[in-house]
Amino acid sequence: MNSILDKKIKSTAIPSLLCDFYKTLHRIQYPEGSQFLYSTFTPRSNAKAPFLHRIVSFGFQAFIMKYLIHYFNDNFFSRSESEVVTEYTKFIADTLHIEDSGEHIAQLHQLGYLPIRIKAIPEGKSVAIKVPMMTIENTHPDFFWLTNYLETLINVSLWQPITSASIAFAYRKTLMQFSEQTCDDHRHLPFQSHDFSMRGMSSLESAETSGAGHLTSFLGTDTIPAISFVEAYYGSKNLIGTSIPASEHSVMSSHGVDELPTFRYLMNKYPNNMLSIVADTTDFWHNITVNLPLLKEEILARPESAKVVIRPDSGDFFTIICGDVTAGTEHERKGLIECLWDIFGGTINNKGYKVLNSHIGAIYGDGVTYEKMVKILEGLEAKGFASSNIVFGVGAQTYQRNTRDTLGFAIKATSITINGAEKAIFKAPKTDDGLKKSQKGRVKVTTLESYIDGLTALDDCSDDLLEVIFENGKLVKETNFDEIRQNIAEQF
């Protein structure tokens, strides 16, 4: 008997069926004579994430290259027609119990490419809520069904990288605001939000695409595959992402409950590198109030580039960093940052805020959210500390606790051509509160805050901010990660 382990699995997802079941039946439900279908992809609401005021365009090129080009070429067009048609018809018969000749699949295979045109906002630019970020339409009248057949694949591939890039952008903007208020310069900003999310993401692909979204605004990451993803689908002449040596609880506990020699051991392992040490495996406050003073001279003797970064990983996020005035001990009343100031000292910057000695620092990464980050930054400012004294390890609470509904992403058909006549179509449910109302007709994005709808294929769209990036199986406009980051930087 053959073992399942003996099967060579190239791909489990059938390229002609990268959709919801009901999509396979819509082809025969459209009006007779249908030729062209045009749809928009739009973030409709930020009600579930009101801090996301700007929605960053990101992930389109990677999606196109990975799926619309490579996946279809490798798993559909490069195989025999009989094989891909049989694969489709057998699956439909076995699951829906419907006879489907698969003629449309055969016709697509014979054509040899996806007859689709996609326009999108340049990656790295950000739009306001309700501004379309992408349009999709078929270019061959025999394949009107293909436009919205791809809806499911587009949504599942794009909502998360766009949402994560938008979150990273919002974090960076907020960190910039606190830096402008409390710091002399902004050199710390590219590293102040560090991606810790990989282990909490839903899949490796989620970690790659979301992690790449984080990297549009930051350089600090522990999600290694995100860097490889950017290299593969965008490329860059500059540093994409980086990290530093760091310990984890297994390391600390393996050395025993007396963590003073463990701190010293790790510092000796990395005498010339910045080093992050998780400090709460046994007794966080003992490490801060007893062990760090004993290590003070050794830490100060290290090169400035070999800063020791203290990482708390439990307790109340605010009181650990900023202190609790009701606590029973002085160190708990002060919090980590003030304790580090008492031990190592620092300087007062030109804006009157305290900056820790450059040999010591702190990172907090336990369940960080936007709201927690802001509260910590406000707490430090109130205590007279510059925002640069803290780095945030941003994990799955930030990047995985989202859905397509976080920004209300949807693809809706807004124009159809039947027997040569184009007409605007739309969705406007009377039972809806306005969220699900779609545009009408073709659209043109006139600014990153506004658009015009009600247009036809005959209207002048030469000034449309939506640019053609994919047409008839080819990527027709390429961007790189440096350009994306430049677009991002221009909006800070």
What is the predicted role of each segment?
Residues 2-72, 216-219, 223-224, 229, ...:
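Gly/Ser/Thr/Ala-enriched C-terminal appendages of enzymes
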Residues 2-49, 101-102, 106-115, 119-350, ...:
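Buried, small/hydrophobic-residue-enriched core segments of structured protein domains
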Residues 75-111:
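Short beta-strand/loop turn elements enriched in aromatics
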Residues 91-94, 152, 199, 412, ...:
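Generic signature of intrinsically disordered, low-complexity segments enriched in small/polar residues
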